[in-house]
């Protein structure tokens, strides 16, 4: 019975000390489960009875959509985001809203107004962010699967640290209507799951064109493909910036592709040093613009007076860069760099079907450890190129270092999501 499974998960959530959830409405989800059991039309849908957690920056009617900030602490969603509507139409149940870095501004899961999320795979370490609660909920078996958002690695980073699967679709594949934006030219909604097969199913469920999001695209259903004849690229610079212990685990993963019949191709990406400055300069400006709606009048509190340190830092830097006398010095140059980075990245896919390598260059730090902003941003150096270039990218578990999971990142050209998802599935089977 679906209601029994829901009750079991609710009990697990209640007993958990991971702090993966911000808002859970037991009465609401149990009532919806009872109604679902009577709904014969949905019984053959791919997500029938699946219990899904949703990141707290995606609107779900009747739940707190706080973005893990005091700014929106009292705001309740008045509608379902397009992805949530699609989940319901496929027979899924929403169990609650997950914890996250405040306004998705972070890579550790520590900046939430509601307290840090713990990593179920290594409880004394960060789970990664910003989709920290979604990843932790899946890793701790507090739900069947979860939805997160990825602006510069916010699905893939925590998936790697927590030892689960995460997928960032190509830009436009999934509607962002109902997402509280961080940087709209980077943002993408995607799945966090226990295995790659589920990532394929969940991506198919939420993707598709949406008249409410002009960037959204219609794509055919993603199917599993044979990857045995694929050329798999390994970028030297991605490996060079990665800690040796992680690199060793990734090299074992590359051997798996070789054993599957793939040809390994050595590649070079000369713009790796531009990745972080380009990403963050654009991110700051877009985030400053996005936060102007949190003025304390229509809903919530005035963001500059209520937000945490990292969010305020990004707002103030974004404001500074946005001022007319500075835009040519920073922002416009960042846009030029983005164009060059994208051209270079797309060129790599002329030589390879996929690019594989590390997800993050170092192991997650200990909870509460004091890192400078630049040390924190360094977690993103291997994930932000995906968002800068609008390509697709997934993460699957690839070993561990003293019990701390390591994730293998698989990248594909724009709208080649099917290739990446297929490679994730095949890697998982053969690893």
Swiss-Prot record:
<dbReference type="InterPro" id="IPR023631">
    <property type="entry name" value="Amidase_dom"/>
</dbReference>
<keyword id="KW-0436">Ligase</keyword>
<keyword id="KW-0547">Nucleotide-binding</keyword>
<feature type="active site" description="Charge relay system">
    <location>
        <position position="130"/>
    </location>
</feature>
<dbReference type="GO" id="GO:0006412">
    <property type="term" value="P:translation"/>
</dbReference>
<dbReference type="GO" id="GO:0005524">
    <property type="term" value="F:ATP binding"/>
</dbReference>
<comment type="similarity">
    <text>Belongs to the amidase family. GatA subfamily.</text>
</comment>
<dbReference type="GO" id="GO:0050567">
    <property type="term" value="F:glutaminyl-tRNA synthase (glutamine-hydrolyzing) activity"/>
</dbReference>
<keyword id="KW-0067">ATP-binding</keyword>
<comment type="function">
    <text>Allows the formation of correctly charged Gln-tRNA(Gln) through the transamidation of misacylated Glu-tRNA(Gln) in organisms which lack glutaminyl-tRNA synthetase. The reaction takes place in the presence of glutamine and ATP through an activated gamma-phospho-Glu-tRNA(Gln).</text>
</comment>
<dbReference type="InterPro" id="IPR036928">
    <property type="entry name" value="AS_sf"/>
</dbReference>
<feature type="active site" description="Charge relay system">
    <location>
        <position position="55"/>
    </location>
</feature>
<dbReference type="GO" id="GO:0030956">
    <property type="term" value="C:glutamyl-tRNA(Gln) amidotransferase complex"/>
</dbReference>
<protein>
    <recommendedName>
        <fullName>Glutamyl-tRNA(Gln) amidotransferase subunit A</fullName>
        <ecNumber>6.3.5.7</ecNumber>
    </recommendedName>
</protein>
<dbReference type="Pfam" id="PF01425">
    <property type="entry name" value="Amidase"/>
</dbReference>
<dbReference type="InterPro" id="IPR000120">
    <property type="entry name" value="Amidase"/>
</dbReference>
<feature type="active site" description="Acyl-ester intermediate">
    <location>
        <position position="154"/>
    </location>
</feature>
<dbReference type="InterPro" id="IPR020556">
    <property type="entry name" value="Amidase_CS"/>
</dbReference>
<dbReference type="InterPro" id="IPR004412">
    <property type="entry name" value="GatA"/>
</dbReference>
<keyword id="KW-0648">Protein biosynthesis</keyword>
<comment type="subunit">
    <text>Heterotrimer of A, B and C subunits.</text>
</comment>
